Amino acid sequence: SVFAVLEKLAEQGRKGIKLHGDFQNFYADEERMIPIYRRCGELGLIVVMHSGIDCSSPYDIHTDAQMMARVLDKVSGVKFVVAHMGGVRCEDEAARLLAGAENVWFDTAYTAGRISPEHMTELVRTYGADKVLFASDSPWNDPKDVHMLIESTSLTAEEKKMIYYFNAERLLGL
């Protein structure tokens, strides 16, 4: 069962899982997913969620900010990372609905060439620099390109350090 797999991952010292509804055939706020999220929280597993549009199903979004807000209303104690700064082409909605959520982080995966430096700065400041994690989504984005995007923002050196490594250290308990 999925619960046995989660327990095995936790026993092995894994830090989390990634879920991608487009490829795993679920919507983030489906009732059948709630016990899975809860068990991840109990086991201390971080849940990374693909969010927003995916090229495999561009007209059928499986995770967005509204769905994640409904999930957060039903579960507590689960650490979520909502990928792609809140969702591919859904970042502004995520900023409105998820900024300030206690157990939610955002990552920079697949942002290079898609989000301007000004918009990235605005999103980081809305979420809080302590809630953003460096990620590339390689091979879709080269880590160097994401790094160049972050470097081209008006974020402070301290905010950039948080994004590049301090936040991950804190989230992962390193």
What positions do the PLM features span?
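Acidic (Asp/Glu)-rich catalytic clusters
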Residues: A4-R14, I34-L43, R70-V75, A94-A101, ...
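Conserved, mostly hydrophobic/aromatic
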Residues: L9, I17, C40, H84, ...
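Active-site gating/metal-coordination segments in enzymes
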Residues: S1-C55, Y59, R114
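Mid-to-C-terminal alpha-helical segments outside catalytic/metal-binding sites
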Residues: T126-L133, N141-L174
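Histidine/acidic-residue-rich catalytic or RNA/ligand-binding cores of hydrolases
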Residues: Y59-M67, C90-A99, S116-R125, W140-S152
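Flexible loop residues that form catalytic
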Residues: D22, G52, G86, A109, ...
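Domain-core and long-helix interface of multi-subunit machines
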Residues: M85-V88, A99-N103, A109-R114
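Hydrophobic faces of well-ordered beta-strands that scaffold small-molecule active sites
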Residues: K15-L19, V47-M49, F80-A83, V104-T108, ...
